[in-house]
């Protein structure tokens, strides 16, 4: 059943050829069989999943629900899930049972989508490899020696290995797109504010954005349709009519102007990645798109700006984890200061502490102007690059990451080389624009993703381009042999 597309599953559920109970049990059996080696789930929720599947079958029998009713989903462990352990990959939240649902979870629950469990991730979404999780590294289903990308590595791995038909992720500097690229799946980071952040544990609030991780662009459109939309509980949620992501999927892309930045093909880009991306651009041209050269001259300023701004926001957001109200608490504190210091130093991992320190430093009185304010200026320059480029084209394409998935442990001792793994994805988060990763081939047996970037609120157009590309390629249908 796991080889069916979500569209086929949906049709079979409606036609009573399969039940949600049988479908959900099939995925739970696969998780039992394979997740021991992948470590893609932090928590599996079989009782909840089966209860929700029974309810979904009743909804379908009564003609209620929607296209995704009865289709199971896995949520990244950054989304609060009522009465389910929600850890954000950290010892700090190892015993935290969420008292409410995040908007993303609430929306899928209301539609009758059984929750299979919570997926593994870099601690507090800080990382590009899913190695910094308190629960151990997740492995890449294409090659168990490789990382799945991060921070949404668990969600990418469960889709690639067929341990869930649909999953959610979050993207602060590339955390949906880079793992999607490394695991050969489709993932979209919507425009900032399109998907509510209510109940999504905060890392860097002006960057964080939730989104779908699926096999195909069509499935991403369906899931985005469920989770997007205005939510008054999130002050940054966009108050505007929701786009129709699905009805334009089959539109012709003849005459579409596709921008290719010269800066994306400079030194440091893996040859195999470059050739796959050029082949994908040629496919778009065959579909009638017009290729135009554009420039993003400030691309290299994005990573330094991001690693001042995001840690600054994190140092503020993570101050709430103090050992007092919830989360990890050290044993036998001598006084309040000792409680704070030891709870935080014992509860947070090395990468999280590194970013809190960098952020606190950037915000300190003597350095605020030199670092934080300067980084804000760079952020505007990077955004303006995109605004100017989109005057000449409709979408921008390039690689998602400079290399295919690297080996587990390869970059863990060198934080800067790990940070540079996100050099193509981070600029988009600085600008707050939508972007997606679409499977586009393999380099040395490991998947490569094509990066599609659009102007604000152009998710429907990006999904349309991706869907058209997937009509003439089958990279998104490939599955690692051991999980077929």
UniProtKB/Swiss-Prot annotation:
One of its GO terms (molecular function) is ATP binding. Keywords: ATP-binding, Ligase, Nucleotide-binding, Protein biosynthesis. It catalyses: L-glutamyl-tRNA(Gln) + L-glutamine + ATP + H2O = L-glutaminyl-tRNA(Gln) + L-glutamate + ADP + phosphate + H(+). The keyword Nucleotide-binding applies. It holds the Pfam family Amidase. It comes from the Bacteria. GO terms for cellular component: glutamyl-tRNA(Gln) amidotransferase complex. Its EC number is 6.3.5.7. The active site is at 76 (charge relay system), 151 (charge relay system), 175 (acyl-ester intermediate). GO terms for biological process: translation. Belongs to the amidase family. GatA subfamily. Allows the formation of correctly charged Gln-tRNA(Gln) through the transamidation of misacylated Glu-tRNA(Gln) in organisms which lack glutaminyl-tRNA synthetase. The reaction takes place in the presence of glutamine and ATP through an activated gamma-phospho-Glu-tRNA(Gln). Heterotrimer of A, B and C subunits. This is Glutamyl-tRNA(Gln) amidotransferase subunit A. It comes from Hydrogenovibrio crunogenus (strain DSM 25203 / XCL-2). The gene is gatA.
């Amino acid at each position: 059943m796991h080889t069916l597309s979500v569209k086929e599953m949906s049709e079979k559920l409606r036609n009573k050829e399969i039940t949600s109970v049988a479908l959900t049990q099939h995925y739970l059996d696969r998780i039992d069989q394979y997740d021991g080696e992948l470590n893609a789930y932090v928590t599996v929720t079989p009782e909840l999943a089966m209860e929700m599947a029974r309810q979904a079958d009743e909804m379908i029998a009564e003609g209620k629900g929607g296209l995704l009713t009865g289709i199971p989903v896995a949520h990244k462990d950054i989304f609060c899930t009522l009465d389910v352990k929600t850890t954000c990959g950290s010892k700090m939240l190892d015993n935290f049972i969420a008292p409410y649902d995040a908007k993303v979870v609430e929306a899928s629950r209301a539609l009758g989508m059984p929750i299979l469990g919570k997926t593994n991730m870099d601690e507090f979404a800080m990382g590009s490899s899913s190695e910094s999780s308190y629960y151990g590294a997740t492995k890449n289903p294409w090659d168990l020696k490789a990382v799945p990308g991060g921070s949404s590595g668990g969600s990418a791995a469960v889709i690639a290995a067929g341990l869930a038909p649909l999953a959610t992720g979050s993207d602060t500097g590339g955390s949906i797109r880079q793992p999607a690229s490394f695991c050969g799946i489709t993932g979209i980071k919507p425009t900032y504010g399109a998907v509510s952040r209510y109940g999504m544990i905060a890392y860097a609030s002006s960057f964080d954005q939730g989104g779908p991780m699926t096999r195909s662009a069509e499935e991403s459109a369906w899931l985005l349709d469920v989770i997007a939309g205005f939510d008054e509980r999130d002050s940054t949620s966009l108050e505007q009519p929701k786009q129709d992501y699905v009805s334009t999927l089959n539109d012709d892309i003849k005459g579409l102007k596709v921008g290719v930045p010269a800066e994306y093909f400079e030194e440091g880009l893996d040859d195999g990645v470059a050739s796959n991306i050029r082949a994908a651009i040629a496919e778009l041209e065959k579909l009638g798109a017009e290729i135009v050269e554009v420039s993003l001259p400030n691309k290299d300023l994005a990573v330094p700006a991001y690693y001042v701004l995001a840690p600054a926001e994190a140092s503020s957001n993570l101050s709430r984890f103090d050992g007092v109200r919830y989360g990890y608490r050290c044993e036998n504190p001598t006084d309040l200061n000792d409680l704070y210091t030891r709870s935080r130093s014992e509860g947070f991992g090395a990468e999280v502490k590194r970013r809190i320190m960098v952020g606190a430093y950037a915000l300190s009185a003597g350095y605020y102007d030199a670092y934080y304010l300067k980084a804000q200026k760079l952020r505007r320059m990077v955004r303006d690059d995109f605004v100017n480029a989109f005057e000449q084209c409709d979408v921008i394409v390039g690689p998602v990451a400079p290399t295919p998935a690297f080996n587990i442990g390869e970059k863990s001792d060198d934080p800067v080389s790990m940070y540079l793994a996100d050099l193509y994805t981070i600029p988009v988060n600085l600008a707050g624009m939508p972007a997606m990763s679409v499977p586009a081939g393999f380099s040395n047996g490991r998947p490569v993703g094509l990066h599609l970037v659009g102007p604000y609120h152009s998710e429907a157009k990006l999904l349309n381009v991706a869907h058209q590309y997937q009509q003439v390629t089958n990279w998104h249908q490939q599955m690692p042999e051991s999980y077929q």
